[in-house]
Design a protein with these regions (language model features):
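Active-site nucleophile and cofactor-binding loops and adjacent substrate-binding regions
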Residues: 6-14, 34-43, 110-114, 139-143, ...
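Positively charged, low-complexity intrinsically disordered leader regions
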Residues: 1-30
Length: 276
């Protein structure tokens, strides 16, 4: 098992990989303000890059759901924080509304430039391994931006002939926020959601979201970075999983804490989501 440490990025988070490209594009189109929703890491990264480019930055956060340390980073960079009652999904909806109303530039991973930038995580890992492709690449599953970017990077590297083997992607959901696991593994209506040659069952996703709303199901896990009930990149993730013959599973919060301990005992630090 090999770990890819992302804490050495400027804001201390993997988000910087995609934020650098997204904010670069925002600057190219002469945006004056960037907007996002965040459970912590995105707010710090967006705020840092906005400050570097002398841009305004509004971040919508779920009330009471962000660690103080992550909030302090965002404040340090002059970010405007707007608290929203509810969870990340609610904050994300509000951020999109605000972006449309104020001509802001959204830098969440719904932005394709974020996905392009995050491909560099895999590039660096494979470069370090002398382009010897591992059997598995494992990601925690939240908004599924990393899953999508990794899958796109694998597809392109394989097409270009840089790699001869396709690694399998494993996505790990938290037990209290496992939308992809439920849909991918047929735990809702007995139908397994797949890419299906670019024609995934969108209605199945919508029916599941409607049931979540009707039954009052809200994502809940101590791993707030992946406490997301409606992953915005779920369709892109399906394509990545199909290309790599990937798998999706769920772990408990307790298992994630055990994972954090194992990482820590080997001299590395990680947040709870990465313990999955």
């Amino acid at each position: 098992l090999m770990l890819q440490p992302e804490g050495y990025n400027p804001s201390g988070s993997f988000k910087d990989n995609g934020m650098s490209t997204a904010v670069t594009h925002a600057k190219m189109v002469q945006a004056k303000k960037i907007i996002c929703a965040s459970t912590g890491n995105t707010s710090a990264s967006a705020g840092m890059f906005a400050a570097n480019e002398n841009m305004d930055c509004d971040v919508y956060i779920p009330e009471g759901e962000i660690a103080p340390g992550k909030l302090s980073q965002a404040y340090q960079f002059g970010t405007q924080l707007i608290q929203v009652k509810g969870n990340f999904d609610d904050a994300f909806s509000k951020s999109l509304e605000a972006s449309n109303q104020s001509n802001g530039y959204t830098v969440n991973s719904i932005n394709p430039f974020r996905i392009e930038g995050q491909k560099t995580i895999l590039y660096r890992a494979l470069e370090f391994m002398n382009w010897e492709v591992p059997d598995w690449i494992i990601y925690p599953g939240g908004a599924l931006g990393n899953t999508s970017s990794c899958g796109k990077a694998i597809m392109e590297l394989y097409e270009w002939g840089w790699i001869k083997k396709i690694p399998r992607i494993a996505v790990i959901n938290a037990e209290g926020a496992n939308t992809l696991d439920v849909l991918y593994n047929g735990k809702f209506e007995g139908i397994e959601l797949r890419w299906n040659d670019g024609e995934p069952d969108i209605e199945l996703i919508e029916r599941y979201y409607s049931k979540m709303q009707k039954d009052g199901i809200r994502p809940k896990t101590k791993a707030t970075a992946i406490q997301i009930g409606k992953p915005v990149n779920i369709i892109k993730a399906l394509r990545a999983l199909e290309f790599t013959n990937g798998v999706v599973t769920t772990v408990t919060d307790s298992e994630m804490l055990d994972g954090m301990t194992i990482v820590g005992l080997n001299g590395f630090d990680c947040e709870m989501a990465s313990g999955s």
